[in-house]
Amino acid sequence: MSITQERKSALIAEHARGKTDTGSPEVQVAILTTRIANLTEHFKTHKKDNHSRRGLLKMVSQRRRLLDYVKNKDVARYQAIIEKLGLRR
């Protein structure tokens, strides 16, 4: 269910705003999106795993808050990250 360190490093490198950037909202949203996708696949076979479902809802809420923050700060960055990650917002 969790993502590997190599995958996380690749996401950071792909979405980082600078050379040493690891915590910008873009990076956080990308990591959360990958984790959400992994959990969604998990729920296709484990429909009654309500404990993990609560974690999924928490991640979705966190991603929504981060996207709202980026949207309020810079709409162009918001549009870019939505386009890059293929989110429907």
From Swiss-Prot:
It comes from Maricaulis maris (strain MCS10) (Caulobacter maris). Residues 1-24 are annotated as: Disordered. It comes from the Bacteria. Keywords: Ribonucleoprotein, Ribosomal protein, RNA-binding, rRNA-binding. Transmembrane segments: none annotated. GO terms for molecular function: rRNA binding; structural constituent of ribosome. The keyword Ribonucleoprotein applies. Disulfide bonds: none annotated. Residues 1-20 have a biased composition (Basic and acidic residues). Pfam families: Ribosomal_S15. This is Small ribosomal subunit protein uS15. Part of the 30S ribosomal subunit. Forms a bridge to the 50S subunit in the 70S ribosome, contacting the 23S rRNA. GO terms for biological process: translation. One of the primary rRNA binding proteins, it binds directly to 16S rRNA where it helps nucleate assembly of the platform of the 30S subunit by binding and bridging several RNA helices of the 16S rRNA. Forms an intersubunit bridge (bridge B4) with the 23S rRNA of the 50S subunit in the ribosome.
